[in-house]
């Protein structure tokens, strides 16, 4: 039996060499490692040392922030929940929200700082309060990594000393892009948090691309003198999302230029091709034998699109459906497929269903109905 796949923008026909960077690659990127990905595609569109684990500066905190955002998304943490800052959390160095030991502050305020500036004190405070202890929080972060297929072991919740590959960052970024709470703050350039005593701390997102690159909605940046400038970015245009990770750029400007070059390449090279929409009629008035109606519309149950190289040519369609169909037919049982081809080669198939049930009017069914009627009336 044909296996049908109907996923929005997750099946891709890419008619160009993709994978490892080398001489003659169509983009020039100044960084130690990088990759360009499309969520749902296992292999990167382009990469240089994309699977090689490296130090990623502040992005080592991304698994913790993602775990927290998922907890907010699921309702485990409410934004209005008051949380107390421990001496340990208040002692965290690096980018911070300037929290003070013993201070009480709402979880929603802490989340802003965790996402926008990777504030270590806010991350630890959220983790300690929401999960009961840092060790339990760390266990939950490890679960997040395992679910995403990232085999890394963290020694603390902030990821001290951990190495991630560019592809790891894109995988984490793809998960973060699905989080409502993460995206809410990752796309904000400037905000502030209000402490319990009325004191305010201004937050400025270091990701300049959310203001300078059309469609960029995040995700996170980081830098350290010895590790360079790192970032994972996501851009959405025309319902297509690309992600890029850059590790070890020499400057902030190089980091953003690298990501911009990768996105420019993607939008210049690929185009989405819409195939079907959920509930859309793919074949009107398809003939039916022995039914209580002579025809039925055939519809797709899912959205389906391809992402093609702009030079790929025209996508053609044929219907792989018995003509005519024979009743009975059921709206939840597939009767065939719409098959899409490129250059004569099948590239995608979408399952088709009757738009409505069609009862059978065959002689056998007629005799059965007569028999049932006879029994109901007592002969």
Predicted regions and their residues:
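Hydrophobic core
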Residues: 9-17
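Intrinsically disordered, low-complexity Ser/Thr/Pro-rich tracts
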Residues: 1, 16-23
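Generic structural signal for hydrophobic residues
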Residues: 9, 140-141, 205, 262
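Sec-dependent signal peptide recognition
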Residues: 2-10
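Domain-terminus/edge residues, biased toward the C-terminal soluble/receptor-binding domains
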Residues: 147-151, 161-379
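Residues in and immediately flanking transmembrane alpha helices
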Residues: 15-16, 74, 274-277
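Hydrophobic alpha-helical segments, especially transmembrane helices
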Residues: 3-4, 62, 237
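Active-site-adjacent loops and short helices of periplasmic peptidoglycan-processing enzymes
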Residues: 20-180
């Amino acid at each position: 039996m044909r296996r049908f796949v109907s996923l929005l923008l997750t099946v891709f026909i890419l008619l160009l060499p993709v994978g490892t960077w080398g001489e003659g690659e169509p983009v020039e990127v100044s960084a130690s490692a990088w990759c360009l990905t499309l969520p749902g595609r296992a292999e990167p569109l382009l990469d240089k040392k994309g699977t090689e684990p490296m130090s990623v500066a502040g992005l080592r905190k991304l698994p913790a922030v993602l775990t927290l955002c998922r907890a907010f998304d699921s309702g485990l943490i409410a934004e209005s929940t008051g949380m107390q800052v421990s001496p340990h959390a208040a002692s965290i160095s690096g980018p911070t929200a300037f929290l003070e030991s013993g201070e009480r502050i709402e979880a929603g305020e802490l989340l802003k700082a965790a996402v926008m500036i990777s504030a270590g004190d806010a991350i630890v405070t959220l983790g300690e309060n929401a999960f009961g202890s840092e060790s339990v929080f760390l266990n939950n972060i490890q679960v997040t990594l395992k679910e995403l297929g990232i085999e890394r072991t963290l020694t603390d919740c902030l990821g001290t000393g951990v190495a991630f590959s560019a592809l790891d960052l894109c995988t984490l970024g793809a998960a973060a892009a699905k989080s409502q709470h993460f995206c809410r703050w990752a796309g904000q350039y400037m905000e502030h948090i209000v402490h319990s005593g009325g004191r305010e701390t201004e937050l400025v997102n270091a990701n300049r691309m959310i203001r300078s690159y059309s469609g960029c909605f995040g995700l996170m940046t980081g830098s350290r003198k010895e590790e360079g400038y790192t970032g994972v970015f996501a851009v959405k245009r025309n319902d297509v999302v690309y992600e890029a990770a850059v590790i070890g750029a020499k400057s902030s400007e190089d980091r953003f230029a690298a990501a911009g070059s990768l996105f420019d390449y993607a939008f210049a090279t690929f185009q989405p091709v819409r195939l079907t929409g959920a509930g859309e009629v793919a074949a009107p008035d398809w003939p039916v034998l022995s039914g209580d109606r002579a025809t039925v519309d055939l519809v797709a149950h899912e959205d389906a699109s391809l992402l093609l190289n702009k030079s790929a040519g025209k996508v053609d369609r044929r219907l792989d459906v018995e003509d005519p169909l024979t009743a009975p037919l059921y709206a939840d049982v597939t009767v065939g497929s719409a098959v899409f081809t490129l250059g004569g080669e099948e590239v995608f198939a979408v399952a088709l269903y009757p738009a409505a049930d069609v009862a059978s009017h065959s002689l056998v069914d007629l005799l059965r109905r007569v028999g049932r009627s006879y029994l109901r009336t007592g002969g």
